[in-house]
């Protein structure tokens, strides 16, 4: 008799667990606004809705969000092993944009995918953004006010390859009125200063040749403020501040500086700018000066 009651109790527990699981795993709905796919330059755009493996990866991620998100910010990662190659996914959930709940999904499979969804009622997720790049690029997403207008924006940063120090940051400004993201703004080796509404950074190119730059958010757009280049006449001991973009500026094209302005000293890539090579010929210096002489601008 005790065995009968024990078996009955086990059945009740199993039924209760299944019932609870059913409550937790509600069927979700995924909607998509009319959005433009954005991608890295060397990656072909694709429609992930026709790829069953990618659909599984994204659906699994959003299903987890639907179960776990209770209104508090949430960040976690997991391995999705039902695909080959195995997918690693990082999920961030919170009231990131306009105090509304959003999900950022960063997943690696055959490509690197970053998607943004707005969480709506009745287990519904509405896609607002889609980015794709090579799986070899470790694209990092972050959310902050890039242009100093008091509204959070989406940033995607990845480390480039090669000898020219190419580390781009893509900025997508969020518009709370339309709940959409802007076209991509690209900055090289950038540091952001939202309180000043300024971006400062180091250009991509040969060390000791490339310049510093500063852009300011004015009237709804990024406006170039100045460039600072090593002064080739003094072998990089001094610098030239100019409004003209381009290596090896002449002194008459700008202001001669005896030192780098303090506002640039904290840039994370400043060391690349300072690597001036005095032991060998600077790249394309002779050609640049000859061309300038021919144009009568020396």
What are these regions (language model features)?
Residues 1-4, 19:
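Positively charged n-region of N-terminal signal peptides that target proteins for export
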Residues 14-16:
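C-terminal motif of bacterial Sec signal peptides marking the signal peptidase cleavage site
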Residues 18-88, 93-94, 201-298:
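Acidic, small-residue rich beta-repeat scaffolds with periodic aromatic anchors
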Residues 60-82, 118-136, 177-191, 195-203, ...:
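Blade-edge motifs of beta-propeller repeat domains
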Residues 87-95, 137-146, 188-200:
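Beta-propeller blade termini
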Residues 97-105, 147-158, 197-201:
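Acidic/hydrophobic-patterned starts of short beta strands in beta-sheet-rich repeat architectures
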Residues 107-111, 163-167, 207-209:
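Short, solvent-exposed loop/turn segments at conserved positions within beta-propeller repeat blades
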Residues 116-122, 165-183, 214-219:
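Beta-propeller blade repeat segments, especially FG-GAP/WD-type strand-to-loop junctions
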């Amino acid at each position: 008799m005790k065995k009968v009651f024990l078996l009955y109790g086990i059945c009740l527990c199993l039924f209760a667990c299944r019932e609870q699981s059913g409550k937790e795993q509600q069927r979700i709905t995924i909607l998509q606004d009319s959005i433009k796919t954005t991608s890295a330059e060397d990656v072909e755009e694709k429609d992930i809705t026709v790829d069953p493996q990618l659909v599984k990866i994204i659906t699994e991620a959003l299903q987890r969000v639907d179960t776990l998100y209770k209104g508090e910010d949430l960040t976690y990662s997991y391995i999705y092993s039902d695909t080959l190659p195995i997918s690693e996914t990082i999920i961030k959930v919170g009231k990131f944009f306009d105090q509304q709940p959003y999900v950022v999904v960063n997943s690696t499979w055959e490509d690197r995918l970053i998607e943004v969804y707005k969480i709506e009622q009745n287990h519904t997720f509405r896609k607002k953004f889609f980015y794709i790049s090579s799986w070899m690029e470790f694209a990092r997403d972050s959310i902050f006010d890039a242009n100093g207008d008091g509204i959070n924006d989406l940033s995607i940063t990845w480390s480039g390859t090669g000898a020219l120090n190419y580390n781009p940051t893509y900025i997508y400004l969020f518009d709370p009125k339309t709940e959409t993201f802007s076209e991509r703004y690209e900055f090289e080796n950038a540091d952001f200063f939202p309180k000043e509404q300024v971006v400062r950074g180091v250009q991509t190119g040969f060390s000791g040749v490339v310049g510093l730059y500063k852009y300011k958010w004015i009237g709804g757009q990024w406006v170039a403020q100045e460039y600072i280049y090593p002064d080739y006449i003094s072998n990089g001991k001094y610098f030239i501040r100019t409004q003209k973009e381009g290596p090896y500026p002449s002194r008459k094209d700008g202001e001669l500086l005896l030192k780098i302005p303090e506002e640039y000293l904290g840039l994370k890539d400043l060391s690349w700018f300072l690597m001036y090579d005095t032991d060998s010929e600077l790249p394309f210096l002779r050609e640049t000066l000859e061309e300038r002489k021919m144009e009568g601008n020396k």
